[in-house]
């Protein structure tokens, strides 16, 4: 598999060889779905909380006598059938949403995503991406000149100017290879990888 190698102006200069074991895999939609869902589920904090009939504010006094009123039987105001009553099966903050995915499956899913991106022409390699100063305008103009509006940039190391310049751009994310997660790879329209970062990705996923 050969990927387009861009120069600093975003123009295709040449091609760079990439291993087929990472960028030449078949598209496995079921595996990609499993990996993405598992990653999102594992990121959940689990902070939902609802009260059961014991925790809501209530009194144990019987609202009316058992018989003779013609109304339905009622025991106390915390009944889940009543307005303001407790939930029957409340959500708890200690609920575990995590999904287990084996390392081999995770790597295979990421490789399948990268392979599909390469086939669609959405993945490119660049010699280096940098800005002279931590200015959002400079980075925005550079990316606009390359025709990139929604892009994930994977660099071998985080450049402070580049990181600060990208913070106010909603559709731009700068990260290192170890932080390139499957959700980000699927979300952004274009993926830009520096040449040194490509070597690290090959080492990680080999």
From Swiss-Prot:
The keyword Ribosomal protein applies. The keyword Ribonucleoprotein applies. PANTHER family: 50S RIBOSOMAL PROTEIN L4 (PTHR10746), LARGE RIBOSOMAL SUBUNIT PROTEIN UL4M (PTHR10746:SF6). One of the primary rRNA binding proteins, this protein initially binds near the 5'-end of the 23S rRNA. It is important during the early stages of 50S assembly. It makes multiple contacts with different domains of the 23S rRNA in the assembled 50S subunit and ribosome. Belongs to the universal ribosomal protein uL4 family. Pfam families: Ribosomal_L4 (PF00573). Keywords: Ribonucleoprotein, Ribosomal protein, RNA-binding, rRNA-binding. Gene3D superfamilies: 3.40.1370.10. HAMAP family: Ribosomal_uL4_B. Signal peptide: none annotated. GO terms for biological process: translation. SUPFAM superfamilies: Ribosomal protein L4. GO terms for molecular function: rRNA binding; structural constituent of ribosome. Residues 59-70 have a biased composition (Basic residues). Residues 49-58 have a biased composition (Basic and acidic residues). InterPro entries: Ribosomal_uL4, Ribosomal_uL4-like, Ribosomal_uL4_dom_sf. It comes from Janthinobacterium sp. (strain Marseille). Residues 43-78 are annotated as: Disordered. GO terms for cellular component: ribonucleoprotein complex; ribosome. This is Large ribosomal subunit protein uL4. It comes from the Bacteria. Part of the 50S ribosomal subunit.
């Amino acid at each position: 598999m050969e990927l387009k190698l861009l120069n600093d102006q975003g123009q295709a200069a040449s091609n760079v060889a990439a291993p087929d074991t990472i960028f030449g895999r078949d598209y496995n939609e079921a595996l990609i779905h499993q990996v993405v869902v598992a990653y999102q589920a594992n990121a959940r904090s689990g902070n939902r909380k609802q009260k059961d009939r014991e925790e809501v504010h209530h009194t144990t006094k019987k609202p009316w006598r058992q018989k003779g009123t013609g109304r339905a039987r009622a025991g106390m105001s915390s009944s889940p059938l009543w307005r303001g009553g407790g939930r029957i099966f409340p959500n708890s903050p200690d609920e575990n949403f995590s999904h287990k995915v084996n390392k081999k499956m995770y790597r295979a899913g990421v490789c399948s995503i990268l392979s599909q991106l390469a086939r669609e022409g959405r993945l490119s390699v660049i010699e280096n991406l940098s800005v002279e100063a931590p200015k959002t305008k400079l980075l925005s103009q550079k990316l606009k000149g390359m025709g990139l509006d929604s892009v994930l940039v994977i660099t071998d190391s985080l450049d402070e100017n580049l990181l600060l310049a990208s913070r106010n751009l909603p559709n731009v994310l700068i990260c290192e290879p170890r932080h390139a997660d499957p959700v980000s790879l699927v979300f952004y329209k274009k993926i830009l990888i520096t040449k040194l970062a490509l070597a690290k990705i090959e080492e990680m996923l080999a």
